[in-house]
Design a protein with these regions (language model features):
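Mature N-terminal, pre-catalytic/accessory segment of carbohydrate-active enzymes
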Residues: 4-5, 15-18
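Anaerobic metallocofactor- and corrinoid-dependent redox/one-carbon enzyme cores
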Residues: 20, 24-201, 209, 216-383
C-alpha cells in the first residue's frame, strides 16, 4: 500500500493498490480517502476521465467525475502517476488503433530523458520553473506523448495553462511566417451561400482591406465537388499572384478531392482535413494515416511555398471522437490531444481547434468552452 501525506484543506489521502510501487500499476483499482469517503478508480483511463474539469460531453459519455470531491480525488492521484506509465499503459490498445501505434512508435526516448523520472505533478512544477524556457520545451516536445500532456493539463489552473503555453513557440511558414512572438495572424473566410465567384471575390477584397488573411485565405465551399474546388482555387490563386500577396490559399474540402485536383494541375497551396485522435474517429472523417501521408507528399511535391513548406491545415475539436463513437471510453480532452499527434506527423501550417463547435451537449457553456480552449492551446503548443 502506498500512503500519501495529508493535503491541506482536503484531509488524509491514502492510495491503496496491489503493489508497493508508486502510482498506478497496470489496470489495478486505486482508492483515495478524502474526509472519510473513499473514491475508487479502476484504471488509468478511468482516472484520466474523472480528473478532467467538468464538461457535458464527458458526463454524457459516463467518464466524468460525479462531483467536485471525486474530481479532486482523481486529480490528487493523477498528480502522483509517473509520466513513464503512459508509455507502459496505452489508454487505447496498440494493436487496435493506428494513432496509438503512431504515438508509441515515434516516441523519442532521448528527448524524454530530462523528465522520465517525474510524476505528472512534478512535471507541472518543472514546466512552471523559470529555468524551463523555450529552447528546453522545444527539445522536449518529441519525447512527450499526448496522454502525458493531457494529464498535466488536468491538474493545471487556467493561469498555469496560459503561462506554460506562452513559453512555447510554434513557428510555421509557407508564403509568410506564422507564430513569431508578438504577432497575430488571421484567416480570411470569404464563404458564399451558393459559391458565387463574384461574391467570393468581393468578400476577399473587403477582408484584405481590413488586414485579414495573412494566415490563410480559406473558403468553406457550399458544395464539396471537384469542379467547384478547382474554380475556387483558381480564383484565390489569381488574386494572390496578381497583387503579390504573401499568403496562402485553401479550399476546405476532403483530402481525396484535394488529391484529385492536384493531379489535374490545379494550383493547391494548403491541404485541409478534419482529424481526430483515434483510428475509428478518423475513419468517420473518411481518412487514415495512409491517405494523409499520400496527400501530404503530393502537396509537398508541388513546392509552392516561398519561405517554407508547411502544407497542411488541420481542424480538430473536443468531442469529435465521442460524436463519431470512436472514443474508446477516453475523455474528450485526451482524445483531442491525441489528434495533435496525428497533426504533428505532417508538420502543418495551421491547426484550428473548433472549441464548442459541435454543440452544448459536448461543451455546455462559456466556462467549459474557455477551459477547453486553454487546454487545447496548451497541449498543442507543448506537442
Amino acid at each position: 500500500m502506498t500512503v500519501y501525506g495529508s493535503h491541506e484543506g482536503v484531509g488524509e489521502g491514502v492510495l491503496a493498490s496491489g503493489t508497493g510501487s508508486a502510482g498506478l500499476s497496470g489496470m489495478e483499482p486505486v482508492t483515495l480517502e478524502i474526509s472519510g469517503k473513499h473514491w475508487t478508480f479502476n484504471s488509468l483511463k478511468d482516472l484520466m476521465g474523472k480528473a478532467s474539469p467538468m464538461r457535458s460531453g464527458d458526463v454524457t459519455a459516463g467518464c466524468a467525475a460525479s462531483c467536485d470531491e471525486e474530481l479532486v480525488a482523481a486529480q490528487m492521484l493523477l498528480a502522483d502517476v509517473p509520466l513513464a506509465q503512459f508509455l507502459e499503459e496505452p489508454l487505447i490498445p496498440y494493436e487496435k488503433d493506428e494513432v496509438t501505434r503512431l504515438i508509441v512508435d515515434t516516441h523519442d526516448v532521448a528527448a524524454f530523458t530530462p523528465v522520465k523520472n517525474l510524476s505528472v505533478g512534478a512535471f507541472r512544477d518543472w514546466l512552471l520553473r523559470y529555468e524551463t524556457d523555450e529552447q528546453t520545451l522545444a527539445a522536449l516536445a518529441p519525447g512527450l506523448t499526448p496522454e502525458m500532456v493531457a494529464a498535466v493539463s488536468k491538474i493545471c489552473a487556467n493561469q498555469d495553462l496560459i503561462l506554460i503555453a506562452s513559453k512555447c513557440r510554434v513557428v510555421t511558414a509557407f508564403r509568410d511566417t506564422i507564430g513569431l512572438r508578438g504577432r497575430l495572424s488571421t484567416r480570411l473566410q470569404p464563404n458564399h451561400a451558393t459559391d458565387d465567384l463574384k461574391g467570393i471575390a468581393a468578400s476577399m477584397l473587403e477582408g484584405l482591406l481590413y488586414g485579414c488573411g495573412d494566415a490563410v485565405i480559406g473558403i468553406n465551399p457550399a458544395t464539396d465537388s471537384v469542379p467547384m474546388m478547382q474554380e475556387l482555387l483558381k480564383l484565390i490563386d489569381e488574386l494572390i499572384h496578381r497583387y503579390h500577396i504573401p499568403t496562402q490559399s485553401c479550399v476546405l474540402a476532403h483530402v481525396t478531392n484535394a488529391l484529385e485536383v492536384m493531379r489535374a494541375g490545379t494550383p493547391v497551396d494548403l491541404v485541409f482535413q478534419s482529424i481526430a485522435g483515434t483510428e475509428i474517429a478518423n475513419g468517420v472523417f473518411g481518412v487514415n494515416l495512409g491517405i494523409l501521408q499520400e496527400t501530404y507528399d503530393a502537396a509537398l511535391s508541388l513546392k509552392r511555398g516561398t519561405v517554407g513548406q508547411n502544407v497542411m491545415y488541420f481542424e480538430t475539436g473536443q468531442g469529435s471522437a465521442l460524436s463519431g463513437r470512436g472514443d474508446w471510453g477516453v475523455d474528450m480532452q485526451t482524445c483531442e490531444a491525441r489528434a495533435y499527434a496525428v497533426a504533428r506527423k505532417f508538420k502543418p501550417l495551421l491547426v484550428n481547434t473548433v472549441v464548442g463547435f459541435i454543440g452544448p451537449e459536448y461543451l455546455y457553456d462559456g466556462k467549459q468552452i474557455i477551459r477547453a480552449g486553454l487546454e487545447d492551446h496548451f497541449c498543442g503548443k507543448l506537442l
